[in-house]
Regions:
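Hydrophobic/aromatic pocket-lining and membrane-interface residues
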Residues: 124, 159, 538
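Active-site substrate-binding loop specific to GH73 endo-beta-N-acetylglucosaminidase modules
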Residues: 72-89, 98-105, 129, 137-350, ...
């Protein structure tokens, strides 16, 4: 995730082999200064198990007289309203808590002494995809992240079994629907297609037989459970082998396939080096993974010590993902905490990568997909928001944002309207039929439940810190070990600090001319009492260059 000049200087005299070894095998490096995730305390036992939908919730409440730990009213209007309020509370609270989780993770990336652990956790997060959109439980997303952090550099077999038994993955790929006699193929398909082998290396019968092996695997809260009555213990024919396989045995058969190591090695190479993986190199790297019994660290050590890694074809060809861009920018600027302004979650979302909300089961496309004309502009906007914070900033974790219906309900209630009037849409012709039916149901009001859910969540979820980046570019430039005397020196200083692939001499000259014009002089010593704003302007331009997107 980048380094400061001091970080680079500290490693200048160290044997490169030792640097790589400590990077891939950091177990003896003390990382105890990193704080654990500070949970808000939004969960209680009554919320588990959480219903699949609001209609499922209200049906359960009507049938049993309670749901989500809340009893329905014996009589009166909107008897189910407290239950519906609680449903929306958890949706909002888990979403906000997951955003807090992303901010916490970004700070770990920024401050860890074991950077490859977090970089690998980011890789696995895009490889073994789960999404809060469907999981709807920050606790499960946290537990999955901790699995990636703990095992991401170790034994791939252990990691793969851990993922197959992970509550977030089980929820995301519908484990509850995978039953003896009626197997659900989602996980069996994805474990081969996306997680281990790649398209074309298995058959549809392999998927069906593999799904049978995983029947009965489920979760209770945040724990993995096996329901023996729902597990199909019969014989299966899977990838050319025959037997009464369970999920772990199916995983072992997958790992025996030669293509599995090649597929995984190729994907890791693309993540760390470049998009094009020569077939011969992919096979050679697969051989390394097989020879080391699927230990990830030796493979990465081989990649990082190879001539290919430092070749012209590889160096400076990696397009930074949004998370890499944002965290490395803060790292190179010497920040110790991720700023709360701009908002981390909104920033990476605008750039195309929302942690814990991947777009599909295939994760993010990586590479050139990160750069479109619109996204390149957004990257420049991010740089500007760091050096010139938005004075109109509204904390998104304290505000429902684009959900205008919730805002309108709150405004109408504040004016003294009753619940029915406050929740009635302004344009009845545009109201969906389903919502019309919900409004006529005297047992509950869906719009009011959504409004109350936000209120209740805001009361419980801890707010994110909202400080801006404590930048002093004047001090930074003047403290340079190489004297900075002219605008051209300033540009060279920022390029040396922030870039792997420097801009052209002509581009540097244009930036220096811009800075000279803003300062009204070529003499940095003369301008040092008033140059902070001009330095921020030129840094914004520098960080918006195409070359800065490369790592």
């Amino acid at each position: 995730m980048g380094a400061t000049p001091d970080d680079a200087a500290a490693l200048a005299g160290v044997d490169p082999a030792r640097i790589v070894h400590d990077l891939v095998a950091p177990q003896n490096i003390d990382n105890g200064a990193l704080a654990a995730f500070d949970e808000s305390g939004v969960f209680d036992a009554g919320l588990d198990p959480f219903p699949t939908s609001r209609p499922a919730l209200t049906d359960q409440a009507k049938e049993k007289g309670e749901a989500l730990g809340v009893k329905i009213k014996p009589s009166g209007n909107r008897r189910l309203q407290p239950v519906v309020d609680r449903f929306f509370y958890w949706l909002r609270a888990s979403k906000l808590e997951t955003q807090r989780l992303g901010y916490w993770w970004a700070n770990r990336m920024l401050n860890t002494k074991r950077p490859l652990e977090e970089k690998m956790a980011l890789f696995w997060h895009g490889h073994f995809v789960s999404s809060e959109e469907k999981v709807r439980d920050y606790r499960k997303m946290l537990k999955q992240l901790q699995l990636f952090q703990a095992k991401g550099l170790g034994d791939f077999r252990e990691l793969l079994i851990g993922v197959a038994q992970d509550p977030a993955m089980l929820a995301y790929l519908d484990a509850a629907a995978n039953l003896k006699g009626a197997p659900n193929e989602n996980f069996a398909r994805e474990i081969m297609e996306l997680f281990t082998m790649g398209v074309g290396n298995y058959t549809e019968p392999d998927i069906r037989e593999g799904a049978r092996a995983f029947t009965g695997w489920n979760f209770a809260g945040t724990k993995f459970v096996v329901n023996d009555e729902r597990h199909d213990g019969g014989d299966k024919n899977f990838l050319g082998e025959h037997g009464p396989f369970d999920g772990v045995q199916v995983i072992d058969i997958i790992l025996k396939q030669p293509v599995t190591a090649d597929y995984l090695a190729g994907k890791l190479y693309r993540f760390f080096v470049r998009d094009e993986v020569p077939a011969k190199l992919r096979t050679e790297l697969g051989d390394v993974l097989r020879a080391n019994k699927y230990q990830i660290a030796p493979l990465l050590e081989t990649i990082f010590r190879s001539r290919d890694f430092y070749s012209n074809a590889s160096c400076g060809t990696h397009i930074k993902s949004p998370v890499e861009l944002v965290v490395s920018t803060y790292k190179k600027l010497g920040l110790g905490v991720v700023p709360g302004v701009p908002d981390f979650h909104e920033t990476i979302s605008a750039l195309g990568q929302t942690l814990f909300w991947p777009p599909t089961v295939a994760g993010w496309a990586q590479g050139r997909s990160w750069i479109t004309p619109g996204l390149l502009i957004e990257r420049g906007n991010f740089a500007r928001d760091v050096v010139f914070p938005d004075i109109g900033f509204i904390a998104p974790d304290r505000h429902p944002g684009g959900d205008f219906q919730i805002l309108q309900v709150g405004e109408k209630l504040a004016r003294g309207l009753d619940i029915s009037s406050a929740t009635m849409p302004d344009n009845k012709d545009q109201m969906a039929t389903a919502n019309m039916m919900a409004d006529r149901d005297e047992d509950f009001n869906t719009r009011y439940g959504s409004y109350r859910g936000w209120q209740m969540a805001l009361e419980k979820v801890k707010p994110l810190p909202r400080h801006t980046a404590p930048l002093n570019l004047t001090q930074m430039v003047l403290a340079s070990k190489t004297p900075v005397k002219t605008p051209a020196d300033v540009v060279d200083y920022f390029v040396g600090r922030m870039f792997l692939v420097p801009p052209s001499p002509a581009e540097r000259a244009r930036l220096a001319a811009f800075l000279e014009k803003e300062l009204g002089t070529k003499d940095i010593a003369h301008a040092q009492t008033y140059m902070e704003e001009s330095l921020r302007m030129v840094l914004h331009l520098i960080l918006s260059l195409p070359e800065y997107q490369l790592g």
